[in-house]
Amino acid sequence: MITINKKTVRSTVTPSAGGTQSNELQAAIKSVTSSTTVGAVFLYDTSADSDGGKWRSKCKGLSWFDEASSTTRSARSEFPAMALIVADSVSGVTIYDLDDPAMPMWMVFNGLSGNYDTKMLWASGNAAGGGLFALNGRVLLGRTWVDFSSDEGGYHHTSAPKIYTGGIGDRNGTTLGGSSIYGAIADNTVNDISATILEGAEIGALGLPIPTVAVATAGGVSVIHPSGDVYNQTHTVYGNNQANSIFWDDKGGLSWASRGGNIYNLHLSNPLYATSSAAPDKIFYTLNNVGSYFPYLLGGTTPITARAGISGEGFASGSSNGLSLVKQNTGNLEESAVTHINSTYNSGYQIGDIRFAGLAGSRTADRSVKANTLAMTGSVTAGVVATDAELGAYSGFSATDYLSQAHDADFDFGTTDFSVMFWVKYSSASGGEYLLKRDTTGGTSNKFGIYTGGSNFTVYAGTESDLSALDVDDGSWHQIGLVRTGGKLYTLEDGKYGASGVASVSTVSNGSAVLHIGQSTDGTSPATNASLSLLRISKTAPSPKQIADIYAAEKPLFQAGAKCLLQSGNNAVNGLAYDKSTSLLTVAQNITSAVPGATIFRGLEQVATFDGKDYDAWSGYSIHDVSTAGGVSVYSRQAGTGGTILDLPALDVRAELNEGESKIPDDGKLHFSASILGATATNIAHIPVNENEAVFVSANVRANEYGGNGERAFYQLKSIYRQDIGGNIVLDDEISTLGSETTASMVAKFDSNTPKGAIEIEVTGVALKQIVWTASVEVQRISEKLYER
């Protein structure tokens, strides 16, 4: 036995006589199975559950807890703190105990799709082969599910959702019971599944909030609420409403990909509380299917292969063309940022309505959707930003060596917002040098550019200019640029706006202007001492927070040895997994040569790779599925000679490390937010109410216009509601409603919704204005159930 922090952890390996640590404290890469019929794998880290995994010790008396040791059950009673769940279309579902370094089987469900009426968790067929997820004691596999906290299981259906008789102890020999509480889903073919805990979630067995489940089906997306209500989003994009690759972000937003010939990523900012065929809040188009929205993602003519939520409201999207990393701007999704990564280039973050993204793996190529390819005059040197780094650097500019583009209306920004950003390194900036200029060859006032006249730099937009305070003449890489926003021109200086900015209202549109990089448009003032990288020009002005985030993400790429590309030359992404505990994104790829099958990123930097063929008798390098959690990774190869491999962290003792802190907010309040365009009344908060229950609800609601304080409001709402058995939710007493707003038509109010079993907060903004709403809600109730998390 090993004791750490007064807790004892089981060990299957005896320490040697010399007192050295057992294998339990050492890194290990182990084969789980050699089967190539594994359809899905999932690492379930119970420390990420709402109670930090404490529910595992409260299950005494449930049918599964004290099962005897057998071929389908280990001798250990409690659910593992860290579990590996493997769904095999031939052998069923196996849960492995990763608290034990020997990785023993903990429980087996041996049901397949043909056993739907006698066994839980079918592991084959479209009904069960679509996605695997676990949260708060629930394991979800396609349409099928089991709940270890309430000791029950069932399946979803378009017309007859069912629950099984008996408990999980009867999993391999049960019968169908009556209908479950859940409504009908959109289609019985399930392609993926995900779950989250929303604000105000009902409390279920063992004090755990009940997850809200999202199912991506062949007929759209179904959102299954804890109450049993199911709402379907069936929006058709160019004749297709099939969905796959679904996930929730940290704020309750829901994202999924279309599955047909035209490929799109769709996003709902707020939970679905009504069946709808209307367009969601945001559609992210791919480069192969250009539409009217931005930013764009890398895509192919085949469906998006994998997607994963990353920190905050960001997400990763993989396709046959590579990887896209998105930082969503929840105030205005059209102003989100995206990076494109493949085996040739890393574009850096492209903001909103991007018009050019170059000097990334090529002197002339434009990595943006606009394809504004540059021309090279003379010879511009291509190198790397630092020794053994992968990011490209471009230098050797002179009067006869430069990059350019003929007039293009994409850069005629008029008097509106726009931005230019890139990275520069100077050995000496003495004398005047143009890093970039867009103007006529003879020179006009309708121009924009960036000029160094010594250690500092100057930015131009029309007739206005602003001088930086940043010293770029120090031999280091710096992020610089210009931003015009809200009628002011600013310098960009290593992740920050310049100190004050200057008024800027003149036009930069010019029907004869050309773009030169590395010199002025008349051929003078060449940037002979500069190296440039990651040039981006956009019709969108990034916010100060976005600039800071982009700087922090890109800066590591300019260090010696920094890697930032995918390993596979064919760029195809098979699977994605993000580990919140380590902030690492793992990309599984199709591999055509002897290179690692998985590339691992921290932000934009590649920090590790994994080669399954090095550790097992795999016949190839491709990895088809991946899951990560708690520092543990599992890789699966489903072709040729393959199988599933587990990569354990160097410090085991996972049962100790994986009992996490409670995720329940300590302020006792529910928190909601939404960004809404226009004056349409919209519900932004959903507070469940049970029958035979009275509740006192107090809410502070704030509103601010996105990008400034033009429109703003504050409301304080206090009311008492009740719902009798079999009755409607009714207002008992409106105690007070206080409000202050810049426009009288703005509204925030409570609204009871009996069919949904909830009190909602309805807000109304201002026509043509993007308003960001936030609500902090306190609920006091007398009930058999508590809903506060």
Segments (PLM) and residue ranges:
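Surface-exposed ligand/attachment interfaces on beta-rich extracellular proteins
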Residues: 199, 407-410, 660-694, 702-713, ...
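Structural signature of eukaryotic scaffold interfaces centered on beta-propeller domains
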Residues: 28-80, 122-136, 182-209, 244-251, ...
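Extended recognition patches within non-cytosolic domains
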Residues: 22-25, 230-231, 271-295, 326-370, ...
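Extracellular glycan-recognition modules
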Residues: 400-458, 489, 526, 540-547, ...
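Extracellular beta-strand elements of beta-rich domains used
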Residues: 422, 480, 532-537, 543, ...
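Short, low-complexity N-terminal tether/leader segments at secretion or assembly junctions of large
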Residues: 1-25
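Extracellular glycan-interaction surfaces
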Residues: 372-400, 420-430, 446-506, 522
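Extracellular glycan-interaction patches encoded by glycine-rich segments
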Residues: 460-467, 510-533
